[in-house]
């Protein structure tokens, strides 16, 4: 009755979409946001560059109101993080080395310079 959180009336209203968006469904879907965040946490624990690397905003991105792009870099690794904060598809070119690996993304494929609505992707090189 209360989205599985309690047998008692909660002080906060339960979201009306709780039957579709809930932990039980997220655990059953390997592509859910639950597992996406697990992967992010795993990367944070296994890649020191994420917490200790030098931060730098990508040149030319200072005034971009749609895309936030930055690097984290240490002596061994560079991460390029590209985030689209809008509900629009945006085209931007970043100099991603040919040998760069797409480390994580919230889309299943990489469309290079096309950054889809709310897309977040991290390249490692």
Model-derived segments and spans:
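Generic hydrophobic, helix-prone segments enriched in Leu/Val/Ile
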Residues: 39, 55, 102-104, 108-109
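Beta-strand-rich binding/interaction modules
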Residues: 88-107
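A short, terminal or domain-edge coil/loop segment
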Residues: 18-23, 104-110
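C-terminal beta-strand-rich structural cap/linker in extracellular carbohydrate-active enzymes
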Residues: 110-125
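A short, polar/charged loop/turn motif at coil->beta-strand junctions and beta-hairpin connectors
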Residues: 63-64, 97-98, 117
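Loop/helix patches that line or flank the sugar-binding groove of alpha-linked glycan CAZymes
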Residues: 1-79, 85-90
């Amino acid at each position: 009755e209360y989205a599985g959180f309690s047998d008692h009336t909660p002080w906060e209203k339960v979201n009306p979409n709780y039957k579709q968006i809930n932990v039980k469904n997220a655990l059953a879907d390997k592509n859910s946001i639950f597992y996406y965040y697990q992967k992010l946490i795993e990367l944070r624990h296994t890649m020191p560059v994420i917490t200790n690397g030098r931060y730098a905003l990508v040149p030319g991105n200072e005034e971009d109101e749609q895309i936030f792009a930055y690097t984290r870099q240490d002596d061994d690794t560079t991460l390029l993080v590209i985030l689209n904060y809008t509900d629009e598809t945006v085209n931007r070119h970043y100099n991603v080395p040919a040998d760069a690996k797409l480390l994580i993304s919230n889309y299943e494929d990489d469309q290079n310079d096309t950054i889809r609505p709310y897309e977040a992707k991290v390249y490692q090189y």
